């Protein structure tokens, strides 16, 4: 086992604080509308240029092991905030640095770190309550666009395209971000439920222009096994033919005699039918078939529930207004399922999302929710170069997370103003314990840090601006984009409540851990000079009688 260095007390905290400052100073230059870029080296290819706090934090690894521990703890603040709220990583880092900086002064002066921590926790609970009281629900498309713009470093085009996407697919719909082919951002919307399976035979195509099969007002047969024998299908086909309506068959596989008969009937015009494979694999396939059944108001024909193909009636089949089947995708538009059933299914999947342990499972479950809730929007990010594309894409993803957070918990005044107003509301908070009160006091001072940093990055004088904002009321704050004061909500400078709340809670949590640290154990640096010399390669060859 390698030798370890153990460092105690003030020296341990001082080294950790140095690490915190190095990381936070690199991250905080990106804060605000006039925040700067940070360039990140890549082991191959062009460097990455970013204004995303968590991207900067993730790149930082310090040489000094004790400093690095401090840096890694603050990196955790940024990552955790990003995971929960999807934005606010720079604000969280700035708050953590401010709480550590103020707190380490008190600890150095001899105050009890555990009492300080209790005070910090009480202050955070009170501030979060005030933020919730000040929160305003986001109702309009304009507010959603403003939140998106602020998160994307005041890029209005990003806010607008996200608001448009939410208008089209609803606030629960899936919105994905992809690389575009042009210089401009584009929005592509797929209405209804789409899954990645196409027709099993090109002979099903009835729209040669689009190379797709379009079924108007069709029935939908959902079967969880393979269909090879046409005899099993005949009762269903006869009933559908009598109703003079098209049929979509979704099964694990349709092949052999069954597929050949369906193709022949389609070509002869006897029956309009299309067969596709069921989406997904294993248990996920069963779940997705059940989703389609609920969306279309049908049943999954499965032996487990006592249903067989021979006994299927029209009441067991799903229905939709229109279905489009391409080579690789099938889209079900306006399924006939009951709204209450769809809502119940969505709730059920949401519970599974909360319980899911892997990111992959969570992502797949979220896709299912979106498909049931009403569509998929794809934002295609346009840029001139690959480097710009990466930077822009990261900003659009941040903005998307921020708007989702705003829809979830509402909005507060942006630009650090919400925290200052919360500070004013809890200014008289006291516990009767002087050391805990010191913890409360240091948090109330630290919440000024985001506004101070926004002003500093804009080239202003932080103390002057903070005093001016504290003298105002309500949403009165400082717009760093054009150096003016006014109502932040009217100026469209908004922050999602969830982002501000999460940033404060995570910053205080990690800062408290740092302040209550009394010893640090790290691997001792290896002494390079003590390494043994390499053995000589040609020793003993001097006397060769030359």
UniProtKB/Swiss-Prot annotation:
Residues of the signal peptide = none
Q: Which GO terms describe its cellular component?
A: cytoplasm
| Ranges of compositional bias, category Gly residues | 536-546
Q: What is its main location?
A: cytoplasm
Under the heading InterPro entries, the entry gives: Chaperonin_Cpn60_CS, Cpn60/GroEL, Cpn60/GroEL/TCP-1, GroEL-like_apical_dom_sf, GROEL-like_equatorial_sf, TCP-1-like_intermed_sf
**Catalytic activity, reaction form:** ATP + H2O + a folded polypeptide = ADP + phosphate + an unfolded polypeptide
Sites binding ATP sit at: 30-33, 51, 87-91, 415, 479-481, 495
Query: Quick one: where's region Disordered?
Result: 527-546
CDD domains for this protein: GroEL (cd03344)
Q: Which PROSITE patterns match?
A: CHAPERONINS_CPN60 (PS00296)
What GO molecular function annotations does the UniProt record carry, in alphabetical order? ATP binding; ATP-dependent protein folding chaperone; isomerase activity; unfolded protein binding
Q: Where in the cell is it found?
A: Cytoplasm
**SUPFAM superfamilies, per database record:** GroEL apical domain-like, GroEL equatorial domain-like, GroEL-intermediate domain like
GO BP, one example?
protein refolding
Enzyme Commission number(s): 5.6.1.7
Which controlled-vocabulary keywords does the entry list? ATP-binding, Chaperone, Cytoplasm, Isomerase, Nucleotide-binding
Query: What function does this protein fulfil?
Result: Together with its co-chaperonin GroES, plays an essential role in assisting protein folding. The GroEL-GroES system forms a nano-cage that allows encapsulation of the non-native substrate proteins and provides a physical environment optimized to promote and accelerate protein folding.
Question: Quaternary state and partners of this protein?
Answer: Forms a cylinder of 14 subunits composed of two heptameric rings stacked back-to-back. Interacts with the co-chaperonin GroES.
What family, per the record?
Belongs to the chaperonin (HSP60) family.
The protein, known as: Chaperonin GroEL
- What is the gene called? groEL
């Amino acid at each position: 086992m390698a030798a370890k260095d153990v460092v105690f007390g003030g020296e341990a905290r001082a080294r950790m604080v140095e690490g915190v400052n190095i990381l936070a100073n690199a991250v905080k230059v990106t804060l605000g509308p006039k925040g700067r870029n940070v360039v990140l080296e890549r082991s191959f290819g062009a460097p990455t240029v970013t204004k995303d706090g968590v991207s900067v934090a993730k790149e930082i690894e310090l040489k000094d092991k004790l400093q690095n521990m401090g840096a890694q703890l603050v990196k955790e603040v940024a990552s955790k905030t990003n995971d929960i709220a999807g934005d606010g990583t720079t604000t969280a880092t700035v708050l953590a640095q401010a709480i550590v900086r103020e707190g380490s002064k008190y600890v150095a002066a001899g105050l009890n770190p555990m009492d300080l921590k209790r005070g910090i926790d009480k202050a955070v609970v009170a501030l979060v309550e005030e933020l919730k009281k000040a929160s305003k629900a986001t109702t309009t498309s304009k507010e959603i666009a403003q939140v998106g713009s602020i998160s994307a470093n005041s890029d209005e085009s990003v806010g607008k395209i996200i608001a448009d996407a939410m208008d089209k697919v609803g606030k629960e719909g899936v919105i994905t971000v992809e690389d575009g082919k042009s210089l401009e951002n584009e929005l592509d919307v797929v209405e209804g439920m789409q899954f990645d399976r196409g027709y099993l035979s090109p002979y099903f195509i009835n729209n040669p222009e689009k190379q797709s099969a379009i079924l108007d007002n069709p029935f939908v047969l959902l079967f969880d096994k393979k269909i090879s024998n046409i005899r099993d299908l005949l009762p269903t086909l006869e009933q559908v033919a009598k109703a003079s309506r098209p049929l979509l068959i979704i099964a694990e596989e349709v092949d052999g005699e069954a597929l050949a008969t369906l193709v022949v009937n389609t070509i002869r015009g006897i029956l309009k039918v299309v067969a596709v494979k069921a989406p997904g694999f294993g248990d996920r396939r069963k779940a997705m078939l059940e989703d389609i059944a609920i969306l279309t108001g049908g049943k999954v024909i499965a032996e487990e529930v006592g249903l067989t193909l021979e006994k299927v009636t029209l009441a067991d089949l799903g229905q939709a207004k229109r279905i489009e089947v391409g080579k690789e995708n099938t889209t079900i538009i306006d399924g006939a399922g009951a709204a209450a059933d769809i809502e119940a299914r969505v709730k059920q999947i949401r519970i599974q999302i909360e319980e899911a342990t892997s990111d992959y499972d969570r992502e797949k479950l979220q896709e299912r929710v979106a498909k049931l809730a009403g569509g998929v929007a794809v934002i295609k990010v346009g840029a001139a170069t690959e480097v710009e594309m990466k930077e822009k894409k990261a900003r659009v993803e941040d903005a998307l997370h921020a708007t989702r957070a705003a829809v979830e918990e509402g909005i507060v005044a942006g630009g650090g103003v919400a925290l200052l107003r919360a500070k004013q509301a809890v200014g008289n908070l006291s516990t009767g314990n002087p050391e805990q009160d010191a913890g409360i006091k240091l948090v109330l001072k630290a919440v000024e840090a985001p506004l101070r940093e926004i002003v500093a990055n804009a080239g202003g004088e932080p103390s002057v601006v903070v005093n001016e904002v504290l003298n105002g009321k309500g949403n009165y704050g400082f717009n760093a984009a054009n150096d003016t004061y006014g109502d932040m909500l009217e100026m469209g400078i908004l922050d999602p409540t969830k982002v501000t709340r999460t940033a404060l809670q995570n910053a205080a949590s990690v800062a408290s851990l740092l302040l209550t640290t009394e010893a640090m154990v790290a691997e001792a640096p290896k002494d390079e000079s003590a390494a043994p010399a390499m053995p000589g390669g040609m020793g003993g060859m001097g006397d060769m009688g030359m």
